[in-house]
Amino acid sequence: MPKGRPSWFKVPAPSQGTQSTYSTASYSRYAQVKDSLQKLDLHTVCEEAQCPNIGECWNGGTGTIMLLGDTCTRGCMFCAVNTDSKPPPPDPFEPFKTAEAVVAWGVDYIVLTSVDRDDIADGGAQHFAQTVQLLKQNKPNLLVECLVSDFQGMLDSVETLALSGLDVYAHNVETVERLQPFVRDARANYQQSLSTLQHAKVVKPELYTKTSIMLGLGETEEEVTQTMTDLRAIGVDVVTFGQYLRPTEHHLSVVEYVTPEKFDHYRQVGENMGFKYVASGPMVRSSYKAGEFYLEHMIKKERTEAAIDIGENA
């Protein structure tokens, strides 16, 4: 295990440090997001998973809202979210609260994610679908990304969400195939994750699919390249790479701090393979503001071009 973080690995303070780092207007945006979440009793993965980019994203007026409560039924060895085999039932008003909060923020792109809920028959797919539909009703031009579990491999649940009106279907494979048993809960596995991403694309081919991989867990370059090859084979459009950070001493240790140069190498490999977008860097996370900005403009551009083509051929 490395002794401390390298000098080039710096994380800005997300809360108290935010006011001095950003302008007063930006800090007010951070406070606005935090206040609206607290008032509506909503959770974000930004806080629960101790994301290092919380200051940047919240100051940009966006966050990743975590549906289905804040307690996960699984116990992955990299994750800081609370776990319990029998978490409280989901709040039936959560989809409505989420729509209210997001519309108030005035954003054009939102990410919805959740804990794993293996205790719910459909894994929470219908809850997600209802939230997406309410968001679209309140703001039709809003782009919605859903970062979801593997739904225990239940393809009916994948289909429910894929057809809900969302724009980006995201599910994280997390790590290379060899390391899956050591990193993820036993109920998750590499092939099951690939099958859910593949089915989402089969059900709705125009849907953007996305996944994320943590580096620094002991993977080899060949394994990372093979993972990208597997993802492209099932039509995944977007992949992100970020450095794994150990949340507590009870979680997996960091094997190495991957250099910025290596992250850039993986970005180039992914782009050469044909991914529509690759975000790769030590601080990149699956729900990352810079990536959302790029995806938003890419989706709008491609849809505008498609509409023009239809008009010309009419």
Swiss-Prot record:
It catalyses: [[Fe-S] cluster scaffold protein carrying a second [4Fe-4S](2+) cluster] + N(6)-octanoyl-L-lysyl-[protein] + 2 oxidized [2Fe-2S]-[ferredoxin] + 2 S-adenosyl-L-methionine + 4 H(+) = [[Fe-S] cluster scaffold protein] + N(6)-[(R)-dihydrolipoyl]-L-lysyl-[protein] + 4 Fe(3+) + 2 hydrogen sulfide + 2 5'-deoxyadenosine + 2 L-methionine + 2 reduced [2Fe-2S]-[ferredoxin]. It is an enzyme of class 2 (transferase). Residues 1-21 are annotated as: Disordered. GO terms for cellular component: mitochondrion. Pathway: Protein modification; protein lipoylation via endogenous pathway; protein N(6)-(lipoyl)lysine from octanoyl-[acyl-carrier-protein]: step 2/2. Its main location: mitochondrion. GO terms for molecular function: 4 iron, 4 sulfur cluster binding; lipoate synthase activity; metal ion binding. Keywords: 4Fe-4S, Iron, Iron-sulfur, Metal-binding, Mitochondrion, S-adenosyl-L-methionine, Transferase. Signal peptide: none annotated. Binds 2 [4Fe-4S] clusters per subunit. One cluster is coordinated with 3 cysteines and an exchangeable S-adenosyl-L-methionine. [4Fe-4S] cluster 1 binds at C46, C51, C57, S287. Residues 58-276 form the Radical SAM core domain. This protein may be expected to contain an N-terminal transit peptide but none has been predicted. This is Lipoyl synthase 2, mitochondrial. It comes from Phaeodactylum tricornutum (strain CCAP 1055/1).
